[in-house]
Amino acid sequence: MPVIHASESAVHQMHGSTFTAYASPARGSRELCAWRIEIPGGTEGVPHHVSREEVLYVLGGTLRVSVDGETGDATAGDVVLVPAGARFGASNLAAGPVTAWVTTTVGFAGVLPDGSWFTPPWAT
């Protein structure tokens, strides 16, 4: 079935944020992964390097992002492009939550500050 209903999504928690997975190999996608992230107010993101290009579309709130040391704020309707290999961090410095839709390709992984590789379950 080409429709993945919200009730069929998989919810994951990490670093205080909620990742709701919709498209991934586990859900029948062969090339793309897509999820919604919700970051509570006052949450500082964990900087990490990404193995694949990542696109974030901000749905609500203000997302503070850092890409290879360049910092900026993205609000509803804005898009953040994160190149493969970039050092990336996303934070929410406001009081309310921020939500974004994230898309990348299958095989996405991150390198955490301690040097360990992490393949997120919402992208597998």
Give the role of each language-model region:
Residues F19-A21, W35-V50:
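Conserved short histidine dyad/triad with adjacent acidic residue
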Residues P40, V50-S51, V58, P83, ...:
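A short, compositionally biased micro-patch
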Residues S51-L63, D68:
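Glycine- and acidic-residue-biased ligand/ion/polar-headgroup-sensing regions
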Residues G69-G85:
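Short acidic-glycine-tyrosine-enriched beta hairpin
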Residues R27-E31, I39-T43, G60-T62, T71, ...:
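Short, charged/polar surface micro-motifs in flexible loops or helix N-caps
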Residues M1-E31, G115-T124:
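A short, N-terminal "cap"/entry segment at the start of jelly-roll beta-barrel domains
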